[in-house]
Protein backbone atom coordinates (compact mmCIF):
# COMPACT_ATOMS: atom_id res chain seq x y z
CA UNK A 1 0.00 0.00 0.00
CA UNK A 2 1.33 3.41 -0.98
CA UNK A 3 0.38 6.00 1.62
CA UNK A 4 1.91 7.80 4.60
CA UNK A 5 3.38 4.42 5.43
CA UNK A 6 4.19 1.73 2.91
CA UNK A 7 3.75 -1.98 3.38
CA UNK A 8 5.01 -4.62 0.99
CA UNK A 9 3.42 -7.97 1.72
CA UNK A 10 3.73 -11.37 0.06
CA UNK A 11 0.68 -13.65 0.08
CA UNK A 12 0.39 -17.34 -0.71
CA UNK A 13 -2.94 -19.17 -0.76
CA UNK A 14 -4.66 -16.31 1.05
CA UNK A 15 -2.10 -16.05 3.85
CA UNK A 16 0.63 -13.51 4.45
CA UNK A 17 3.97 -15.30 4.31
CA UNK A 18 6.26 -12.27 4.45
CA UNK A 19 5.94 -8.55 5.00
CA UNK A 20 7.95 -5.55 5.97
CA UNK A 21 7.15 -4.16 9.42
CA UNK A 22 5.12 -1.12 8.37
CA UNK A 23 4.95 0.27 11.90
CA UNK A 24 8.12 -0.98 13.55
CA UNK A 25 10.85 0.47 11.38
CA UNK A 26 11.31 -1.91 8.46
CA UNK A 27 9.90 0.01 5.53
CA UNK A 28 10.84 1.89 2.38
CA UNK A 29 11.06 5.61 2.98
CA UNK A 30 7.67 7.23 2.64
CA UNK A 31 6.05 10.64 2.76
CA UNK A 32 6.36 10.50 6.57
CA UNK A 33 8.98 7.86 7.40
CA UNK A 34 12.69 7.35 6.98
CA UNK A 35 13.92 4.06 5.55
CA UNK A 36 16.79 1.94 6.80
CA UNK A 37 19.13 4.11 8.81
CA UNK A 38 22.88 3.88 9.22
CA UNK A 39 23.07 2.19 12.61
CA UNK A 40 26.07 3.97 14.12
CA UNK A 41 24.76 7.42 13.20
CA UNK A 42 21.35 6.55 14.65
CA UNK A 43 22.98 5.42 17.90
CA UNK A 44 24.94 8.69 18.00
CA UNK A 45 21.73 10.67 17.51
CA UNK A 46 19.94 8.70 20.23
CA UNK A 47 22.71 9.32 22.74
CA UNK A 48 23.45 12.92 21.75
CA UNK A 49 21.27 14.24 24.56
CA UNK A 50 19.49 16.49 22.06
CA UNK A 51 16.36 14.37 21.66
CA UNK A 52 14.02 12.38 23.86
CA UNK A 53 13.00 8.83 22.94
CA UNK A 54 9.63 10.15 21.71
CA UNK A 55 11.34 12.79 19.55
CA UNK A 56 13.61 10.19 17.94
CA UNK A 57 10.60 7.97 17.18
CA UNK A 58 8.78 10.96 15.67
CA UNK A 59 11.83 11.76 13.50
CA UNK A 60 11.75 8.19 12.18
CA UNK A 61 7.97 7.95 11.75
CA UNK A 62 5.96 11.10 11.26
CA UNK A 63 8.61 13.70 10.56
CA UNK A 64 10.84 11.65 8.26
CA UNK A 65 10.66 11.05 4.53
CA UNK A 66 9.17 13.88 2.49
CA UNK A 67 8.20 15.78 5.65
CA UNK A 68 11.89 16.14 6.56
CA UNK A 69 12.79 17.36 3.06
CA UNK A 70 9.78 19.44 2.07
CA UNK A 71 7.70 20.06 5.19
CA UNK A 72 4.76 18.15 3.71
CA UNK A 73 3.59 14.57 3.37
CA UNK A 74 1.46 15.41 0.32
CA UNK A 75 2.74 13.36 -2.62
CA UNK A 76 0.66 15.42 -5.05
CA UNK A 77 2.45 18.55 -3.86
CA UNK A 78 5.88 16.95 -4.27
CA UNK A 79 4.99 15.70 -7.76
CA UNK A 80 3.79 19.21 -8.66
CA UNK A 81 7.03 20.71 -7.36
CA UNK A 82 9.00 18.29 -9.53
CA UNK A 83 6.91 19.16 -12.58
CA UNK A 84 7.57 22.84 -11.85
CA UNK A 85 11.32 22.21 -11.97
CA UNK A 86 12.22 21.61 -8.32
CA UNK A 87 15.28 19.37 -8.70
CA UNK A 88 15.14 18.16 -5.08
CA UNK A 89 11.54 17.01 -5.60
CA UNK A 90 12.47 15.18 -8.81
CA UNK A 91 15.38 13.40 -7.14
CA UNK A 92 13.27 12.53 -4.08
CA UNK A 93 10.52 11.04 -6.26
CA UNK A 94 13.01 8.94 -8.24
CA UNK A 95 14.52 7.63 -5.00
CA UNK A 96 11.03 7.04 -3.56
CA UNK A 97 10.01 4.91 -6.55
CA UNK A 98 13.31 3.00 -6.62
CA UNK A 99 13.14 2.25 -2.89
CA UNK A 100 9.61 0.84 -3.14
CA UNK A 101 10.53 -1.24 -6.20
CA UNK A 102 13.50 -2.74 -4.34
CA UNK A 103 11.24 -3.84 -1.48
CA UNK A 104 8.74 -5.37 -3.92
CA UNK A 105 11.39 -7.21 -5.93
CA UNK A 106 13.05 -8.55 -2.77
CA UNK A 107 9.81 -10.30 -1.76
CA UNK A 108 9.95 -12.33 -5.00
CA UNK A 109 13.04 -14.10 -3.67
CA UNK A 110 10.89 -15.74 -0.97
CA UNK A 111 8.96 -17.65 -3.64
CA UNK A 112 11.79 -18.14 -6.14
CA UNK A 113 10.24 -15.54 -8.43
CA UNK A 114 6.91 -17.38 -8.69
CA UNK A 115 4.73 -14.29 -8.31
CA UNK A 116 1.29 -14.14 -9.95
CA UNK A 117 0.67 -10.41 -9.74
CA UNK A 118 1.88 -7.26 -8.00
CA UNK A 119 -0.89 -5.04 -6.64
CA UNK A 120 -0.39 -1.34 -5.95
CA UNK A 121 -2.97 0.31 -3.67
CA UNK A 122 -3.30 3.40 -1.53
CA UNK A 123 -3.36 7.10 -2.28
CA UNK A 124 0.07 7.00 -3.92
CA UNK A 125 -1.33 4.66 -6.57
CA UNK A 126 -3.17 7.65 -8.07
CA UNK A 127 0.22 9.07 -9.11
CA UNK A 128 0.90 8.12 -12.73
CA UNK A 129 4.64 8.78 -12.45
CA UNK A 130 4.85 6.79 -9.22
CA UNK A 131 3.00 3.82 -10.72
CA UNK A 132 4.86 3.90 -14.04
CA UNK A 133 8.21 4.15 -12.24
CA UNK A 134 7.44 1.19 -9.99
CA UNK A 135 5.97 -0.82 -12.87
CA UNK A 136 9.07 -0.22 -15.01
CA UNK A 137 11.27 -1.65 -12.26
CA UNK A 138 9.19 -4.66 -11.15
CA UNK A 139 7.13 -5.90 -14.09
CA UNK A 140 9.93 -8.37 -14.87
CA UNK A 141 8.77 -10.16 -11.70
CA UNK A 142 5.03 -10.23 -12.47
CA UNK A 143 2.27 -8.15 -14.05
CA UNK A 144 1.38 -5.01 -12.09
CA UNK A 145 -2.24 -4.11 -11.33
CA UNK A 146 -3.25 -0.81 -9.76
CA UNK A 147 -6.11 -0.19 -7.33
CA UNK A 148 -5.77 3.45 -6.29
CA UNK A 149 -7.28 4.54 -3.00
CA UNK A 150 -7.48 3.28 0.53
CA UNK A 151 -9.98 0.50 1.12
CA UNK A 152 -9.13 -0.72 4.62
CA UNK A 153 -12.01 0.88 6.53
CA UNK A 154 -14.56 0.14 3.81
CA UNK A 155 -13.43 -3.48 3.67
CA UNK A 156 -13.56 -3.88 7.45
CA UNK A 157 -17.04 -2.31 7.61
CA UNK A 158 -18.41 -4.43 4.77
CA UNK A 159 -17.01 -7.68 6.14
CA UNK A 160 -18.18 -6.81 9.66
CA UNK A 161 -21.67 -6.18 8.30
CA UNK A 162 -21.60 -9.48 6.40
CA UNK A 163 -20.64 -11.34 9.60
CA UNK A 164 -23.31 -9.60 11.69
CA UNK A 165 -25.98 -10.26 9.07
CA UNK A 166 -25.03 -13.94 8.81
CA UNK A 167 -23.71 -13.72 5.24
CA UNK A 168 -20.13 -14.53 6.21
CA UNK A 169 -18.35 -16.42 8.93
CA UNK A 170 -15.40 -15.41 11.01
CA UNK A 171 -12.32 -17.19 9.76
CA UNK A 172 -10.07 -18.74 12.35
CA UNK A 173 -6.61 -19.96 11.51
CA UNK A 174 -5.22 -22.93 13.38
CA UNK A 175 -2.17 -21.63 15.22
CA UNK A 176 -0.80 -25.17 15.29
CA UNK A 177 -1.12 -25.72 11.54
CA UNK A 178 2.19 -26.15 9.76
CA UNK A 179 3.44 -23.02 8.09
CA UNK A 180 3.80 -23.10 4.32
CA UNK A 181 7.37 -23.56 3.17
CA UNK A 182 8.38 -20.14 1.79
CA UNK A 183 11.19 -21.78 -0.19
CA UNK A 184 8.94 -23.89 -2.40
Regions found by a protein language model. Name each.
Residues 12-19, 133-142, 167:
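A glycine- and small-aliphatic-rich helix-loop capping segment at beta-alpha/alpha-beta transitions
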Amino acid sequence: MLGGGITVTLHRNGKVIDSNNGVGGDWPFTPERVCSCPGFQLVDLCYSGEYSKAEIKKKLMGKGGAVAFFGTNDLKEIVRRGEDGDVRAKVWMKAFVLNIAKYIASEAADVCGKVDVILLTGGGAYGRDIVSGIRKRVEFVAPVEVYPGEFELQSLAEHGYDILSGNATILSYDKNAPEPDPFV
